[in-house]
Amino acid sequence: MEDIAKDMHIAKKTIYKFFPSKEALLQGIVEYGFSHIQENKKNILQQDIPYLEKLKKLLIAMPADLESIDFKQLEPLQSQYPAVFHQISTHLSSDWKPVLDFIQKGIDEKIIRDIPLYMIEVIVTSSMNSLLSSSCSPASYQQSINDLADILMKGILIWNNVS
């Protein structure tokens, strides 16, 4: 809290007026971040870009102001602030309806193979959670998510549509 107050040039008391604890502050940051991710997804869906480009953007949907965060550094939250870590995991496992609806559109238009949507959701969410809980990848979280999107998309494309 001291570091945050110092960086913001305010007193710790001011922070504690809005957030009664470090955990409450972290929960607020998580909510802020994920609300921006959802807003970013809405903006992507409104863009006039090719289907596959839009799909990849949706899968990685990280707003520019959060791209520099290496989410793998959040692993200590699991032991220090389990409620915050659970909140992150819950967000990663939910909020997929717009993406799944968009994938269904691709299935309907024969751009994507007819595969169960729940399986895509399981693969993506479990991979994201695994990347958060693991330091096995030498790449940043954002790069790992980009890699995941590439692997997923190349596995779901109908090959005669690949350019």
Model feature map: region roles:
Residues E23, L55-K56, V84-S89:
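Short alpha-helical transmembrane interface motifs in multi-pass membrane proteins
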Residues H36, L58-I69, E109, S127-S134, ...:
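Phosphate/oxyanion-binding loops and surfaces in catalytic or ligand/nucleic-acid-binding neighborhoods
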Residues G28, E39-S68, I120-V124:
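Hydrophobic alpha-helical connector segments
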Residues E53, K57, K97, D101-K105, ...:
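C-terminal peripheral helix-coil segments that are non-catalytic and often amphipathic
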Residues P63-D101, I107, S133:
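Short secondary-structure transition hinges
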